[in-house]
Amino acid sequence: ECIGHRRSCKEDRNGCCKLYTCNCWYPTPDDQWCKCLL
């Protein structure tokens, strides 16, 4: 499992999530967080 700050799920394709399912939630209007799960 990998958790990281991302501006969007699409951008995270270049990060740790690229082989996993990316679930995003929005702690603030200006930020998104991705949690990558197997």
From Swiss-Prot:
Main location: secreted
Disulfide bond annotation, renumbered to this chain: 2-17, 9-22, 16-36, 24-34
Any single Gene Ontology cellular-component annotation: extracellular region
Superkingdom: Eukaryota
Keyword tags: Disulfide bond, Knottin, Secreted
Tissue: Expressed by the venom gland.
Location within or outside the cell: Secreted
UniProt free text on domains: The presence of a 'disulfide through disulfide knot' structurally defines this protein as a knottin.
Family membership: Belongs to the neurotoxin 02 (plectoxin) family. 09 subfamily.
Record protein name field: U9-ctenitoxin-Pk1a
Species lineage: Eukaryota, Metazoa, Ecdysozoa, Arthropoda, Chelicerata
